Amino acid sequence: MQKKIIVYTDGACSGNPGKGGWGALLMYGASTREISGYSPATTNNRMELSAAIEALETLKEPCIVHLYSDSSYLVNAINEGWLKRWTANNWKTAAKKSVENIDLWQKILTLIKLHDVTFHKVKGHSDNPYNNRCDELARQAIKNNR
């Protein structure tokens, strides 16, 4: 039986592009693990995607994952079928432009094949303590690398 994991993720950028950080919470039963990271030159969208990638890469076996993010870019790409269309169109948008962050999207595609992942949109910077904690982790990662 696969483990059921709840994941919250967030990314932040000081300037866009600029220095960036990401944070994630992984919850299984009564256990919570916090992870975070930093990039010296990035964008907010790359940090949002990186948070999801790093969280999913942390899992050591296939799991049932409910991933919560305040990133419409991440959640809509999965739930609205953008990612499927991009891959079907050889990584081109509906406007025939190259999709940004292809390297990260390819990693996400690989990871969501390993796990049973459901993506959920949460409101950012509101009263969700888990999302707020991920935001703190992401901002702290930037601050720690100034």
From Swiss-Prot:
Catalytic reaction(s) noted: Endonucleolytic cleavage to 5'-phosphomonoester
Residues reported in the UniProt entry to bind Mg(2+) 2: 10, 135
Limits of the RNase H type-1 domain: 1-143
Pfam family, one: RNase_H
Record keywords, A-Z: Cytoplasm, Endonuclease, Hydrolase, Magnesium, Metal-binding, Nuclease
Keyword Lipoprotein: no
Cellular-component GO terms for this entry: cytoplasm
Compartment(s) of residence: Cytoplasm
Enzyme class, broadest EC rank: hydrolase
EC number: 3.1.26.4
Biological process terms in GO annotation: DNA replication, removal of RNA primer
Named cofactor requirement(s): Mg(2+)
Residue numbers binding Mg(2+) 1: 10, 48, 70
Cofactor binding note from Swiss-Prot or TrEMBL: Binds 1 Mg(2+) ion per subunit. May bind a second metal ion at a regulatory site, or after substrate binding.
InterPro entries, alphabetized: RNase_H, RNaseH-like_sf, RNaseH_domain, RNaseH_sf, RNaseHI
Calcium found in the keyword field: no
GO molecular function, one term: nucleic acid binding
Major localization listed first in the record, in broad terms: cytoplasm
Gene3D superfamilies: Ribonuclease H-like superfamily/Ribonuclease H
Xref: HAMAP family: RNase_H (MF_00042)
Family membership noted in the UniProt record: Belongs to the RNase H family.
UniProt function note: Endonuclease that specifically degrades the RNA of RNA-DNA hybrids.
Subunit structure: Monomer.
The protein's name in its UniProt record: Ribonuclease H
Gene assigned in the entry: rnhA
